[in-house]
């Protein structure tokens, strides 16, 4: 953890892929969860997004504020912020929680004080998502794994 102090605790730091935008959040986070919604899937380009949520007053941009681009979802009014240099999703703000801010967990450089134990929009989870099936190394491709094929029983 970085040595900066907020009113009640130390800060954890994070940044976008290119490092243009940097931020800090007071430790610990309020909650963490996996979001399987279509909107988060499209915003992140991934099967789901993992967020850390905290009070807005416990989060601050420390560098690169001018590099942040914002997008408002017309249906929900939610605002998603991205680094305009590298495209990294930075912040997700929901209209029904105006005092809270949600940050992708992967952007933090250390522990946030919360493990993602919640799942939202589970009904939107894709059938092609990895669900913990056993994996085997792919022959000839070091570091690549694949689902084990189910053997058909011979009659």
Residue ranges and their predicted role:
Residues 1-15, 20-155:
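A short Gly-Trp-Pro
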